[in-house]
A protein has these predicted regions:
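Structural core segment of the AMP-binding/adenylate-forming
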Residues: 1-67
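Short beta-strand->loop structural element characteristic of the AMP-binding/adenylate-forming
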Residues: 1-6, 13, 98-101, 135, ...
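Gly/Ser/Thr-rich phosphate-binding loop
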Residues: 38-42, 157, 177-185, 194-255, ...
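Conserved pre-ATP/AMP-binding loop-to-beta segment of ANL
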Residues: 53-89, 96, 121-132
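Conserved AMP-binding A3 loop
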Residues: 85-112
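Conserved AMP-binding/adenylation subdomain of ANL enzymes
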Residues: 108-132, 140-182, 196
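Conserved ATP/PPi-binding loop(s) of AMP-dependent carboxylate-activating enzymes
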Residues: 262-266, 277-302
Length: 302
């Protein structure tokens, strides 16, 4: 397990009941350089006292692990498309959080589906210019994991990681340094951004798309975003179990319509009643999804 030292005391308590054999400890200043990193770590540990005492025998510091690995030789494992890639735990909206078993082919499929879906947008980026995507979402969330991180790798793009999107002034300061092309976010972040006085300190003229997920985007927020950037928020729908994107509004849409759009390529969706039968047009029902991005099942829950 790789863990921030701020939470190591919690890990220490539960470690004996797990099968974990290796612990890598990270500190907030590890990637900030020798002097700035040391200063940040001192403040976090001693001034703000954000690191409770702990004792984990055999734990290795992050920088030490990197140093050890720099001289090692990578032995690539034999990975097949049906091998498990991620146990993506759900938000627990229906009870206890469950581990969605996502295979390598599930994630690859969803990246390719999103690439095909967004081609009309990304194709408008000037030739030779690197696609720049903002990631103001936690990477442990499937939205950020696939749509931001994996999508940027597929595109050979630049991913701007925002550590704390609640700190809008700092986020705007960072975004103002870049030519932003794609802005994925949740409604609360879109709302906070467009209503903040520093929103226009960012040059949004290079924006080709804004995508909303995680929760419904409010119409008033979408309207204000369109007025200020000239680009609509394209809302989609997905969940941990579908890697995550299952549907979306067409990439060439010119306005927000309040819907979750239509299924992605090679994806089928139905609305079913309590008996598992399709509901009539216009009636509410449970969404059933079939496609290459759908999980293999729930971990240890046959």
């Amino acid at each position: 397990i790789v863990i921030l030292e701020n939470f190591a005391s919690t890990l220490e308590k539960c470690l004996p009941a797990t099968a974990i054999r290796h612990v890598v400890l990270c500190a907030m200043g590890d990637q900030l350089g020798l002097f700035k990193g040391a200063l940040v770590n001192y403040v976090v540990r001693h001034s703000k006292k954000l690191v409770p005492s702990f004792h984990i025998p055999g734990a290795v510091r992050f920088n030490e692990a990197v140093a050890r690995g720099s001289s090692a030789t990578l032995s690539r494992p034999d990975i097949r498309s049906d091998d498990v890639a991620v146990l993506q735990y759900t938000g627990g909206t229906t009870g206890v959080s469950k581990g969605a078993v996502l295979l390598h082919r599930n994630l690859v499929a969803n990246v390719l589906q999103n690439e095909a879906w967004g081609a009309p947008l990304m194709g408008t980026i000037p030739r030779g210019e690197q696609a720049t995507i903002v990631c103001a979402l936690p990477l442990y969330h499937i939205f950020a994991f696939t749509y931001c991180m994996m999508q940027s790798m597929r595109l050979g793009g630049k991913l701007i990681l925002i550590a704390n999107p609640r700190d809008l002034p700092t986020m705007f300061q960072e975004l103002s340094k870049h030519r932003i092309h794609l802005m994925p976010a949740v409604n609360t972040l879109f709302n906070g951004m467009v209503n903040h006085p520093e929103f226009n300190t960012v040059d949004w003229s290079h924006l080709v798309g804004a995508t909303g997920g995680g929760s419904a985007v409010q119409g008033a927020v979408a309207k204000l975003w369109l007025e200020k950037t000239g680009r609509p928020i394209l809302e989609g729908y997905g969940l941990s179990e579908t890697s995550p994107v299952a549907s979306g509004n067409p990439a060439d849409a010119t306005d927000y319509n309040g819907s979750i759009g239509v299924p992605l390529p090679n994806t089928w969706m139905k609305l079913l009643d309590d008996d598992g039968k399709p509901v009539a047009q216009g009636q509410a029902g449970e969404i059933a999804i079939k496609g290459p991005q759908v999980m293999a099942g729930y971990w240890q829950r046959p």
